[in-house]
């Protein structure tokens, strides 16, 4: 009898294993399909816009200095590749240094805001007020104080980029389920151990959300600095192209700046995936299942 019952349970176990394998395979297929569609759909939109742009400028006879066709912009990209690479490298250095400075100051500042409520009540109004101040108005002062070198551009990138890091880090450290803290205390964790093993990992998604916003704002800050007082960089190149009415080079510089910004954003996103892969996977699964 026992042997018959054991034999009767085997098909049920096999059916459950088969069902789980089928569900996992279906999830993988949905993820793959979502990745492909996430690439193909935007690409189709871009190609459609470029085709309409090319056809419209040629059929309507729009002057090149007003709106060059994409083919002319592509030609300018090829012809000025070395120039764009040189100025792009200068802008990249300014962005990265401003971004690193934002992290080096923003995260400790957020930690102080989280740890000391009095400090938080004192400093937060000043931080919010600083964001209401237009950075373009501050840029000439930085040029007067620090000259026309690299430092003013880095500082402008920092001033624009550090605020999201401060806010997202402070929110991430403050937002945690009380049950996790109770569990850590019941296991005998001290304050430092609880912070390092529970609170900080829990805050990583919020922190990286702020970092991704910050890196895009650092691009804006570097370009603003180059507009005001640069002698190199993509922002400076855009000013030169605008002054000489070289619209093709102007569009080429905008494209190069866009590619640079997207590339830096993807670097931060890759760091996020390496630091918190479970969070990313869980987010993807929730998106696809919904």
Where is each model-derived feature located?
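C-terminal transmembrane helix and the adjacent membrane-cytosol boundary/short C-terminal tail
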Residues: 117, 205, 251-290
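N-terminal signal-anchor transmembrane alpha helix
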Residues: 33-59
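Generic hydrophobic transmembrane alpha-helix motif, especially the helices
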Residues: 127-164, 171-175
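Transmembrane alpha-helices
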Residues: 155-159, 191-225, 252, 256-257
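Hydrophobic alpha-helical elements at and bordering transmembrane segments
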Residues: 77, 84-88, 92, 122-130, ...
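Short cytoplasmic-facing helical segments at TM-TM junctions of multi-pass membrane proteins
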Residues: 165-168, 172-213, 234, 238
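Periplasmic/extracellular loop-to-transmembrane helix junction in inner-membrane transport proteins
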Residues: 22-32, 58-103
């Amino acid at each position: 009898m026992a042997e018959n019952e054991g034999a009767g349970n085997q098909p049920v176990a096999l059916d459950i294993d088969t069902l789980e394998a089928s569900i996992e395979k279906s999830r993988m297929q949905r993820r793959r399909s979502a990745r492909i569609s996430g690439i193909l759909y935007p690409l189709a939109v871009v190609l459609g816009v470029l085709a309409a742009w090319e056809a419209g400028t040629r059929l309507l006879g729009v002057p090149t200095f007003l709106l060059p066709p994409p083919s002319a912009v592509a030609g300018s990209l090829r012809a000025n590749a070395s120039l764009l690479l040189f100025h792009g490298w200068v802008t990249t250095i300014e962005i990265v240094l401003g971004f690193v400075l934002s992290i080096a100051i923003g995260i400790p500042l957020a930690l102080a805001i989280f740890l000391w409520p009095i400090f938080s009540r004192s400093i937060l109004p000043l931080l919010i007020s600083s964001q209401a101040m237009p950075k373009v108005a501050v840029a000439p002062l930085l040029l007067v104080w620090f000259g026309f070198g690299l430092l003013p551009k880095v500082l402008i990138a920092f001033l624009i980029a550090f605020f999201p890091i401060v806010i997202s880090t402070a929110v991430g450290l403050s937002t945690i389920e009380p049950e996790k803290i109770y569990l850590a205390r019941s296991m005998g964790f001290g304050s430092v151990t609880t912070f390092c093993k529970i609170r900080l990992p829990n805050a990583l998604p919020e922190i990286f959300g702020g970092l991704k916003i910050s890196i895009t704002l650092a691009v804006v800050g570097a370009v603003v600095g180059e507009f005001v007082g640069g002698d190199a960089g993509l922002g400076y190149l855009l000013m030169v192209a605008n002054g000489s009415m070289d619209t093709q080079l102007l569009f080429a510089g905008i494209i190069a700046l866009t590619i640079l910004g997207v590339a830096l954003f993807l670097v931060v996103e890759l760091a996020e995936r390496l630091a918190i892969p479970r969070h990313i996977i869980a987010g993807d699964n929730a998106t696809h299942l919904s």
